[in-house]
């Protein structure tokens, strides 16, 4: 099972990815985690990423795609993976399609969690309160100003990725405003179809 979960910040991608990871016994691949691991491991692509990150730059699409390509070759990803935080742009989506084609792999599903942006801020604020109440640390970007920036960036750069996958005929949508178990059930239904 190879899949991508799309949706704006606060849509529940992390929650659903975690559930899918446990249910399908496949890794959840976060580009941020992969970048840090590649840098730590000193891989050729990790060294390129480190040079860019140390200089304060944004890691290029080519480097990110290279890190994803390396990661999906690891033994735990042989039976599939869930991409989390990637692709973020149409250019990355196109590069991923090319890379998977070269590896003779296909995506089984691209699922977008569709949510009401106005309700997302309330969801983010609730998550922050629950995290604090549980004694955890609130994400630095779980505040109204940062959230607005994140949602604007999503709208501008990442939302077009949905249109790209729709044009490929692989995009499925799920109502991300439903409760967590209902969203999980809707995703399961798509994956079993």
UniProtKB/Swiss-Prot annotation:
PROSITE patterns per the UniProt record, alphabetical: ADENYLATE_KINASE (PS00113)
Record-listed AMP binding positions: 31, 36, 57-59, 85-88, 92, 139, 150
Positions with a binding annotation for ATP: 10-15, 127, 178
GO molecular function, one term: ATP binding
InterPro entries given in the database record: Adenyl_kin_sub (IPR006259), Adenylat/UMP-CMP_kin (IPR000850), Adenylat_kinase_CS (IPR033690), P-loop_NTPase (IPR027417)
Compartmental location: Cytoplasm
UniProt entry tagged with the keyword Cytoplasm: yes
Catalytic reactions of this protein: AMP + ATP = 2 ADP
Entry's transmembrane regions: none
Main location: cytoplasm
One of the protein's GO biological processes: AMP salvage
Signal peptide: none
SUPFAM superfamilies for this protein: P-loop containing nucleoside triphosphate hydrolases
CC per GO annotation: cytoplasm
Region (LID): 126-142
EC number annotated for this UniProt entry: 2.7.4.3
Pathway: Purine metabolism; AMP biosynthesis via salvage pathway; AMP from ADP: step 1/1
Function text: Catalyzes the reversible transfer of the terminal phosphate group between ATP and AMP. Plays an important role in cellular energy homeostasis and in adenine nucleotide metabolism.
PANTHER family with a match to the protein in the record: NUCLEOTIDE KINASE
Record text about domains: Consists of three domains, a large central CORE domain and two small peripheral domains, NMPbind and LID, which undergo movements during catalysis. The LID domain closes over the site of phosphoryl transfer upon ATP binding. Assembling and dissambling the active center during each catalytic cycle provides an effective means to prevent ATP hydrolysis.
Family label: Belongs to the adenylate kinase family.
NCBIfam families, sorted: adk (TIGR01351), PRK00279.1-3 (NF001381), PRK14527.1 (NF011100), PRK14528.1 (NF011101), PRK14531.1 (NF011104), PRK14532.1 (NF011105)
Assembly notes: Monomer.
Protein name: Adenylate kinase
